[in-house]
Amino acid sequence: MIQEWYEVWVDESTKIPYVLFLCPDPSNPGGMLIIDPKENNRIIQKLPDYNTAMLWLTEDEYTRVDGRMEIE
């Protein structure tokens, strides 16, 4: 799966923060994927756009780690 960038989102409500990745969906222009690295990078959500993905993450009390990681 080739990506241009990804964001790191964390749930800090637990003793050890839980991490998810947010990245563009290469099979759906404008779409977003939420990936769980702890589950062997399994895609846990496919969402239609960035705003919907942000709402999904913030509803579950995830916060974005500052910055966006570029992939070369």
Task: Identify the function of each model-found stretch.
Residues 1-14:
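Negatively charged, low-complexity tracts enriched in Asp/Glu with abundant Ser/Thr
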Residues 11, 36, 51-54:
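Generic structural signal for short, flexible, solvent-exposed coil/loop and linker residues
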Residues 14-42, 59-63:
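Short aromatic-glycine-(Arg/Gly/Cys) micro-motifs in beta-strand/loop hairpins
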Residues 42-72:
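Mixed-charge, Lys/Arg-enriched low-complexity segments
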